[in-house]
A protein has these predicted regions:
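Flexible, small-residue-rich helix->loop connector segments that border functional cores
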Residues: 98-102
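Acidic/His- and Gly-rich active-site-bordering loop/insert found
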Residues: 1-85, 90, 94-97
Length: 102
């Protein structure tokens, strides 16, 4: 998932493909997914189980403008001037949803 989110490199509030990817994974893991939370198309809340304790996990998966980069150890943009992941949100988002996997 992290590699796919890296390739999507979608800016904040525009992460349609990334959000869909994460939500589909959670549904396959038997989570109930509520989409479009607080009027934000890409925001979602996924729940599973009941009772206590309640555990909440935040997943961020937005990219930053102007930082397009192929997954190589030297500067090589995927798209000149495009967006990219420079602070690990592709990993953060994927790991956050994977933390709830069964």
């Amino acid at each position: 998932m992290a590699d796919q989110i890296w390739r999507y490199a979608e800016l904040g509030y525009l992460e349609q493909k990334s959000s869909k990817l994460l939500q589909e994974f959670l549904v396959k893991q038997n989570f109930d997914v509520r989409r479009g939370v607080d009027g934000i198309d890409t925001a979602f809340v996924a729940t599973a189980g009941s009772g206590l304790p309640t555990i909440a996990i935040l997943a961020e998966f937005d990219a930053l403008p102007g930082l397009s980069q192929k997954a190589v150890p030297y500067r090589e943009p995927m798209e000149s001037g495009g967006s990219g992941h420079a602070c690990g949100h592709h990993l953060f988002g994927a790991a956050s949803v994977a933390a709830g996997a069964r």
